[in-house]
Amino acid sequence: TLGAPAPSVSFFAEAITTNIIRQCQRHEIPLPRLIIEPGRSIVARAGVALYTVGVVKEVPGVRYYVSIDGGMADNIRPALYGAKQEAVLANKMRAKEIGKFTIAGKFCESGDILIRDIALPQPMAGDILAVPGCGAYCLPQASNYNASFKVAVVLVNEGKARLIRRRETL
């Protein structure tokens, strides 16, 4: 989740080893070898999900919805456990924010909401919505829900882009 600091390795090490040592002593068993997979703290910032804006719809007196060409099949975290994410319109980085918008996925599910009430410049069909902080769990948790295809992956390094996984097809 963007903005939420990942717990440090030393935080985890202290919390886990203290309990393991105590329990091993209590049960008179030898200490095991401990290996920690730091996950999010290493790769979360390495991934940015890019979506194309479709329809922008106003529900009078309620809110504005921005539909995108992805959703809960490629980023389940907001629907599954309420992960909070940020986003920008990549092609309007210098434009002034004009209001709050709710980013809705393409699946016909009431829970397919990526971000609620985010301040953005005026979104229009064809704009590119960039969601940072997607490197840790979006790809491993992606599914083929509702017959959707898993997304392509592009590696960008030193100003050069390379397709490293094609989008799925039939």
What do these predicted regions represent?
Residues 12-24:
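Alpha-helix-loop-beta-strand connector modules within alpha/beta enzyme cores
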Residues 1-9, 38-42:
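Active-site-proximal beta-alpha loop/turn segments in soluble metabolic enzymes
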Residues 15, 29-170:
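Charged (often Lys/Glu-rich) extended helix/loop segments that serve as interaction or gating elements
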